[in-house]
Amino acid sequence: MAMRQCAIYGKGGIGKSTTTQNLVAALAEMGKKVMIVGCDPKADSTRLILHSKAQNTIMEMAAEAGTVEDLELEDVLKAGYGGVKCVESGGPEPGVGCAGRGVITAINFLEEEGAYEDDLDFVFYDVLGDVVCGGFAMPIRENKAQEIYIVCSGEMMAMYAANNISKGIVKYANSGSVRLGGLICNSRNTDREDELIIALANKLGTQMIHFVPRDNVVQRAEIRRMTVIEYDPKAKQADEYRALARKVVDNKLLVIPNPITMDELEELLMEFGIMEVEDESIVGKTAEEV
């Protein structure tokens, strides 16, 4: 099987890193050879696979060594659960420099050192927040990742971010091979959430590839710095991540999305009763005035 490169995007705090690591653990359990490249200065994209607080990042180690050229692949690449290879790009201190630059440096270093040549089945890029500009767009801008999966929920801002990320994909899809593989709904237990995300996916021309229900076992596993797959393999939630992994393996629906307007998104939310029909007469009125 040819190596597949996938990037996971989504609104900040939506559960991208947790979802990615549980998905990757399920793939490893299936016998797939996987590498995770964390593209977030927080360096939390690999902690559940490695059972660590935060992996040393390429940018930190490059600063200590002098330059990135002074690093060896084994300095930055750590193996975790199921033989999953883990790398964190890292970034500068908050408020200093461009964190996206760390992503560019990291991916270039991995390529030059031959990290992608080791009969891998999948590479996953876990990308910061909903930023699709600059360095954070590198996995899609430079055609590193061919498949994009967007983690979202039935909350308005998560859907807004999914639509924005779709716009970024369209921008780069026309000049390369990047495509949207689907929406992963990481449930927040909002009303009619699965129906709403299926409707959004239809409008974008894609699919809801899986609905991941909310379950406290995820937090219990995270406290122990473990994926659910490893912490409680018999849990129903572990089966949800296995189902997601199988769907990703079998996925053939890779599309250039059709982003919608803000008005269309609001209409969709109104249709599902998430948002009230707009009444211009109440705009700017205080609670007392209304």
Swiss-Prot record:
<dbReference type="GO" id="GO:0046872">
    <property type="term" value="F:metal ion binding"/>
</dbReference>
<keyword id="KW-0013">ADP-ribosylation</keyword>
<feature type="binding site">
    <location>
        <position position="98"/>
    </location>
    <ligand>
        <name>[4Fe-4S] cluster</name>
    </ligand>
</feature>
<keyword id="KW-0547">Nucleotide-binding</keyword>
<feature type="binding site">
    <location>
        <position position="133"/>
    </location>
    <ligand>
        <name>[4Fe-4S] cluster</name>
    </ligand>
</feature>
<comment type="subunit">
    <text>Homodimer.</text>
</comment>
<dbReference type="GO" id="GO:0009399">
    <property type="term" value="P:nitrogen fixation"/>
</dbReference>
<dbReference type="GO" id="GO:0016163">
    <property type="term" value="F:nitrogenase activity"/>
</dbReference>
<keyword id="KW-0004">4Fe-4S</keyword>
<comment type="similarity">
    <text>Belongs to the NifH/BchL/ChlL family.</text>
</comment>
<dbReference type="InterPro" id="IPR005977">
    <property type="entry name" value="Nitrogenase_Fe_NifH"/>
</dbReference>
<dbReference type="InterPro" id="IPR027417">
    <property type="entry name" value="P-loop_NTPase"/>
</dbReference>
<dbReference type="Pfam" id="PF00142">
    <property type="entry name" value="Fer4_NifH"/>
</dbReference>
<feature type="binding site">
    <location>
        <begin position="10"/>
        <end position="17"/>
    </location>
    <ligand>
        <name>ATP</name>
    </ligand>
</feature>
<dbReference type="GO" id="GO:0051539">
    <property type="term" value="F:4 iron, 4 sulfur cluster binding"/>
</dbReference>
<keyword id="KW-0535">Nitrogen fixation</keyword>
<protein>
    <recommendedName>
        <fullName>Nitrogenase iron protein 1</fullName>
        <ecNumber>1.18.6.1</ecNumber>
    </recommendedName>
</protein>
<dbReference type="InterPro" id="IPR030655">
    <property type="entry name" value="NifH/chlL_CS"/>
</dbReference>
<keyword id="KW-0408">Iron</keyword>
<keyword id="KW-0411">Iron-sulfur</keyword>
<keyword id="KW-0067">ATP-binding</keyword>
<feature type="modified residue" description="ADP-ribosylarginine; by dinitrogenase reductase ADP-ribosyltransferase">
    <location>
        <position position="101"/>
    </location>
</feature>
<keyword id="KW-0560">Oxidoreductase</keyword>
<keyword id="KW-0479">Metal-binding</keyword>
<dbReference type="InterPro" id="IPR000392">
    <property type="entry name" value="NifH/frxC"/>
</dbReference>
<comment type="function">
    <text>The key enzymatic reactions in nitrogen fixation are catalyzed by the nitrogenase complex, which has 2 components: the iron protein (component 2) and a component 1 which is either a molybdenum-iron protein, a vanadium-iron, or an iron-iron protein.</text>
</comment>
<dbReference type="GO" id="GO:0005524">
    <property type="term" value="F:ATP binding"/>
</dbReference>
